[in-house]
């Protein structure tokens, strides 16, 4: 008898114990690979936080020194209570905290991939979950968030984490609300999600427990208002200051413009795939899941509603507020590719196979664009590394340090470099000025001149804004008469004129 005779040969596929062992080995192997990739990226691409995160680190240092954060700065970013608390925890690490935060953010991205994998696997199985992670890896916009240690990334992780908790145990209750409360201390969109979830669990929850749930729902907005009141004396400071900055950059364009922007903003880094193929995958997912599709549909629908509420409130109409629906559409791309495997009805299965073939052809056509996306991401990372290392080098150059400490103002081309200088040197806000905010050209102090006017790579700057005039002044990023060269650290040069 042949050793391959199916009547006698063991079938490891049918052995549940063997299956579990293989699953565990595969899981550990993939996690190990993910950790390895994170460490390689951290070493190869030595990036730094963005403008908002650096100001958060400055505020954390102020808290650690026993002072309230000073939000009254030129073009202040919106303060977020939880991110400021994290910055306070990071303060003992000194000027190493920026790179530590980038490393934590990269691990946060890995955690996000894990959560989206488990979320998709619970709904649609392992094959589609693996496809979903593969699609997510093409989202270079998400990877840029991690490389810049932006606090948007942990927010998305928490939102999908809360959805996963609910998916694993319907009407989960306080664990979901606790995660949403933490997310609500990073971005107010979670307030609406928490409120709607409370209404969802209310019919089946005893009144005493429902009251405790209500306290969790109210926790994030109350703590945010209280933080603003303590720091500024204005409980609505975050809202009013954000609206003012939005108006300054021309981002508050109203509900009409917001609606017209939805298809573009949903697209992430590839509107054809995310909106087009993702839209087809959404139809397949709804057909497969039926009632089980309500949770992701509600999550995406509330994301759209929040975006419109933000627009109606005069706040920024920018892509970040549609990221949750956009990410859900990216998951649907995986359904478009593999959903046919879960459909038994012949006609529907043929349609799903047709969608899968069409989707695969579109992805093959778009493959070169993904290569360009990664090339662009690498260029951005290289630009960020050069800018920050050069600036930090200038700030520590022996010939420049005395002038930087005692010869003010320090003038930089734009506001983008100000929080980095304050973070590195500990100088007060009055010591550093952006040329775009000056009424007249400086006659003394230190000029920090860059090889380029913009401190940030193009994709890291605000998009879709319509400023009426350029903020650049005639003297911006130029050597002025009477200033002498102090030091050069490519791409930065310091010039000084001290009385």
Could you describe each region identified by the protein language model?
Residues 55, 194-195, 207-280, 305, ...:
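Membrane-lumen/periplasm interface segments of specific transmembrane helices
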Residues 2-12, 16, 168-173, 178, ...:
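Perimembrane helix-loop-helix junctions
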Residues 358-418, 424, 432-433, 437:
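Membrane-embedded, lumen/periplasm-facing catalytic core of multi-pass transferases
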Residues 35-36, 100-124, 157, 161:
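Transmembrane-helix motifs of polytopic, lipid-linked glycan transferases
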Residues 21-22, 122, 204-214, 281-301, ...:
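Membrane-interface helix-loop-helix junctions at transmembrane boundaries of multi-pass membrane enzymes
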């Amino acid at each position: 008898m042949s050793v391959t005779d199916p009547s006698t040969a063991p079938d490891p596929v049918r052995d549940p114990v063997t299956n579990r062992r293989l699953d565990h080995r595969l899981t550990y192997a993939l996690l190990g690979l993910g950790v390895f990739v994170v460490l390689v990226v951290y070493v190869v691409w030595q990036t730094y936080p963005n403008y908002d995160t650096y100001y958060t680190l400055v505020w954390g240092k102020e808290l650690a020194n026993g002072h309230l954060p000073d939000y009254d700065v030129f073009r202040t970013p919106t303060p977020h209570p939880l991110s400021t608390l994290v910055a306070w925890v990071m303060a003992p690490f000194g000027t190493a905290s920026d790179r530590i935060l980038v490393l934590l953010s990269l691990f946060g991205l890995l955690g996000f991939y894990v959560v989206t994998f488990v979320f998709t696997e619970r709904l649609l199985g392992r094959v589609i979950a693996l496809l979903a992670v593969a699609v997510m890896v093409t989202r270079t916009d998400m990877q840029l968030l991690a490389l810049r240690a932006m606090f948007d990334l942990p927010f998305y992780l928490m939102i999908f984490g809360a959805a996963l908790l609910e998916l694993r145990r319907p009407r989960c209750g306080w664990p979901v609300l606790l995660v949403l409360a933490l997310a609500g201390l990073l971005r107010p969109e979670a307030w609406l999600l928490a409120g709607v979830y409370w209404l969802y669990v209310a019919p089946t929850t005893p009144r005493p427990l429902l009251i405790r749930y209500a306290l969790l729902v109210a926790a994030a907005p109350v703590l945010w208002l209280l933080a603003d009141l303590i720091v500024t004396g204005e409980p609505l400071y975050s809202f009013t200051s954000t609206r003012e900055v939005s108006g300054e950059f021309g981002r508050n364009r109203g509900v009409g413009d917001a609606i017209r922007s939805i298809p573009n903003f949903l697209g992430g880094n590839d509107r054809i795939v995310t909106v087009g193929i993702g839209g087809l995958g959404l139809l397949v997912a709804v057909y497969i899941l039926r009632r089980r599709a309500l949770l992701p549909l509600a999550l995406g629908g509330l994301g759209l509603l929040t975006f419109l509420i933000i627009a109606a409130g005069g706040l920024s109409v920018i892509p970040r507020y549609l990221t949750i629906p956009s990410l859900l559409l990216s998951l649907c791309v995986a359904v478009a590719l593999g959903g046919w495997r879960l459909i038994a009805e012949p006609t529907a299965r043929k349609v799903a196979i047709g969608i899968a073939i069409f989707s695969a052809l579109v992805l093959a056509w778009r493959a070169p664009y993904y290569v360009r996306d990664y090339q662009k991401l690498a260029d951005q990372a290289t630009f960020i590394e050069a800018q920050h290392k050069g600036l930090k080098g200038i700030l520590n150059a022996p010939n420049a340090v005395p002038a930087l400490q005692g010869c003010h103002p320090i003038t930089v081309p734009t506001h983008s470099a100000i929080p980095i200088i304050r973070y590195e040197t500990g100088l007060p806000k009055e010591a550093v000025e952006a040329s775009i905010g000056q009424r007249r050209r400086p006659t003394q102090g230190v000029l920090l001149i860059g090889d380029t006017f913009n401190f940030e790579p193009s994709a890291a700057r605000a998009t879709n804004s319509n400023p009426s005039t350029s903020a650049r002044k005639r003297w911006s990023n130029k050597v002025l008469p009477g200033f002498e060269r102090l030091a050069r650290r490519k791409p930065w040069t310091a010039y000084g004129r001290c009385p």
